[in-house]
Amino acid sequence: VSRKWSINTAIDVLRETIREADEMGLSDVTICPEVLGKINQLGTLEEILEMCRIDERLIPTVDFGHLHARGMGCLNSPEDFEKVIEDIESSIGVERTRKLHVHFSRVEFTTGGEKKHWTIDDIQYGPEFEHLAGILIKKSMEPVIICESRDNMAEDAAKLRDIYINSGGKLYEESSHY
């Protein structure tokens, strides 16, 4: 099975899902396809953006740990994160990008991509949330951020929140999303 066939099939399924949601009166639902961490899986950032371009109600879930793993450790500076955000903005627009759905954790990877999620304190793995937090603030973004740390999600979510606030960010009411 080719990647092209897989992406076309995924797009067809998304279109059908949106049509069925509309028929059920759920036209206000947002669907967030996710960047996946293993090289052999459908779900590169470019593939997810291609899916999201078919309807305004599709917002990418950018798992920065997965992106870092797929790129063999590619997110090492604020500029690396800013480039990702700018690529998303040029693909789906600034306003949809401002409301991005984000997953974040440190990730161990191999040549096949993601191997294992780790905690924020496992500093031998990347990426660094501080780099992303600064870009989110600089671009006045209001993303939903989900912490996916291994065995420590609630505690690490609080650490991510504190990093964001200490970087100058402010928290937004949940009702302002989507």
Q: What is each residue range found by the language model?
A:
Residues 1-62:
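Active-site acidic/histidine proton-transfer and metal-coordination neighborhood
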Residues 69-141:
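Gly/Pro-rich active-site loop or hairpin
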Residues 145-155:
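A short, acidic, flexible beta-alpha connecting loop/helix-capping segment that sits on the rim
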Residues 31, 63, 102, 145:
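Conserved, mostly hydrophobic/aromatic
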Residues 4-16, 46-56, 113-133, 155-172:
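Short, electropositive alpha-helical surface patch
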Residues 1, 35-39, 64-68, 106-108, ...:
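Active-site-proximal loop/turn and secondary-structure-junction residues that shape catalytic pockets
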Residues 21-28, 53-57, 92-96, 138-139, ...:
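Short helix-capping segments at alpha-helix termini
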Residues 11, 16, 20-30, 75-79, ...:
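A structural signal for the main folded, soluble domain(s) of proteins
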